[in-house]
Amino acid sequence: MTIATEISCPEEEAFQLLDKYSWFPNDDQRRWWEYTGPNLLKLLRDAQYPQKDQISCLYLLQQLLVPYLGTFPVAGQAPLPWWSNVTTYGVPFELSWNLLHNIVRIGFEPLSHLAESGVDAFNKIAPEECLSRLACLDNTIDLARFRHFQHQLLVTPDEERRLLEEKGPLPKSGRGQQALAVEFQNGGISAKAYFFPGMKSLATGLSPGKLILDSIESLALPGLKEPVHHLCNSLGLQDDGHPTDTAIAPFLLGVDLCTPERSRLKFYVTDQVVSWDRVADMWTLRGKRLEDPQCADGLTLLRKLWDLLEIPEGYRSNIRPDFAFGTPPPEDYRPVMMANWTLSPKKKFPDPQIYLLTVGMNDAVVMDALVAFYEVLGWTDLASTYKDKVASY
């Protein structure tokens, strides 16, 4: 007797298969599912994930992520009760597709009614709960590093009390201290955590850069000393964690939630000076990485993308605008630049990633630039279908 093990259904029925008898405790969760489910499915199809993986990814979204997305945003209605750090508009959910490695990813900040009502004023409960449930489903998710940085970078109960009692009204945005990401690959998942030390900085008086560097140092990994030294030297980070250039601001630490020996750390900054010279400095660590042929090749491609996008150079405000959901940003809005560096004991220099933010730019112009760049890379199939793919979402 043969037992079939493959799940088979027409692609258009994959969402309906899970939706037909789904139950949600409130309308917000139902609406999150109806919005995110089809979009995730389409992205998985575009990335050519096997159908059985598409269904399991959808099921994970429905059962484990949707319950932690909070109030569903509606254009023209009251602002969201919790303004997330994950996206420009404060929405706690972001889908993305890593084209180079063909990995679909969900970035999100787990929320609950406790955070939205102010009871959990710094949203410490939902991320912990959600991640613990994820770890129960997949034994490749290791929480050792997560626990370490929780202890180092989240406000303590005493610090939380002082912030609420002594610091006056806290800003609407920036109160979140943690975000998560789930990547779908090889038929399973991997997870990452992100720590925003802004509230810890406000409570302790220590700079975000100092808090992040101290938390890394407390891991006591000898192999990290050299890459951290090169990073600090290139960014001009002083003993107090402040860069000598005040336009640069450390603000975020990312960590892979896998076994500690494989876990990478990512150190994030924003830069208010947006220019090609700054991009080149960040990519090469002020020239230190140029001896690496991959660095030079990457710099050439970066220059090509920079020229194609025609991002206006200049100095940007670092004040986070209060965008209204569903409305475009002002025509004169220009975002800061972002970068991160991956710190690994196995590498002398940290590996950079540069974020050329296009919020506020014309979408058609950006798409034309990306199509031209994909052609430069030899990704002809993607170049020929990219605009139609984007328009279909």
UniProtKB/Swiss-Prot annotation:
GO terms for molecular function: prenyltransferase activity. One of its GO terms (biological process) is alkaloid metabolic process. InterPro entries: Aro_prenylTrfase, Aro_prenylTrfase_DMATS, DMATS-type_fun. Dimethylallyl diphosphate binds at residues 105, 192, 194, 268, 353, 355. It catalyses: 12alpha,13alpha-dihydroxyfumitremorgin C + dimethylallyl diphosphate = fumitremorgin B + diphosphate. It comes from the Eukaryota. The keyword Protein transport does not apply. Belongs to the tryptophan dimethylallyltransferase family. NCBIfam families: arom_pren_DMATS. This is 12-alpha,13-alpha-dihydroxyfumitremorgin C prenyltransferase. It comes from Neosartorya fischeri (strain ATCC 1020 / DSM 3700 / CBS 544.65 / FGSC A1164 / JCM 1740 / NRRL 181 / WB 181).
